[in-house]
Every structure is written in structure tokens, then in C-alpha cells.
Amino acid sequence: MLKDPCAMVSLSDAGAHLTFFNDAGFGLHLLGHWVRERGLFSLEEAAWRLAGQPAHVFGIRDRGALKPGYAADLLLFDPARVARGPKRRVHDLPGGAARLTTDAVGVHGVWVNGRQVADANGLLPDAPRAGALLTRFSD
């Protein structure tokens, strides 16, 4: 099913049920498990499935590829190490409520609209809020 060209492997409801289960890190799992360990996808095909395909399907014109004029969204990772870490419970919701989370493994940095927002240690505390709400897609 993952190899079906009509299947989108890059959608998640991470956060919708965060107290019960956690889909965060599904992209890292795709890169580590299905690309590196199982060889089901090439690295290029996985990058397309995670970024290019959703931008194409949803008509988001300036996303999904590294091209002049496109938003410079980038995940820098080590293909030999990339994975998601073990799931763990944290108590950082209102009232000290618990949720599940997972850490990135083998990720060196994240850039949103050309601005670095995370490094190998996690979110940068002084990073600008570089994201933008997309309100229009192509017709």
C-alpha cells in the first residue's frame, strides 16, 4: 500500500489525539525504516512523498522542492542515522496533563522559509517564527 502512487504517506493527525497515541515523527520513520532499513523507497522518492507530492496534490505552488523562488523549507539529516526516538510521556499540557512525544534522531537542523528554527538539540529558543498560514492554494 505504501508504494501505491496514489497513497499519500505524508499526512498525519499528530496532535489530534496526543494524550492517547502519537504519530509525530512519521516522516523520520519513513526515512529510517522504509528507506534505510527496508529499502522500499529511494531517498529521492521518500523526499518526494513527504514534501513534493503533498504540495502538488494540494496545489501549494511554492513549496515541496528546493528551487529558486520557493519557500526554503529544509530538513538536514544524516541518512545513516535518521529515525524517531522512543515515545515518551511529558506533562506540559494545561493543568499538568500528559501527552506522548518522540524526539528526532539524526536530524542536524530545520529551516522554515530560509530561517533556521531547530538544530540537533531541538528548537532554537530565539528562532524567529518563520512559518506562515497558507490561506490560498492554486485552483
Task: Give, region by region, the residue ranges found by the protein language model.
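Active-site microenvironment of metallo-dependent hydrolases
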Residues: 1-139
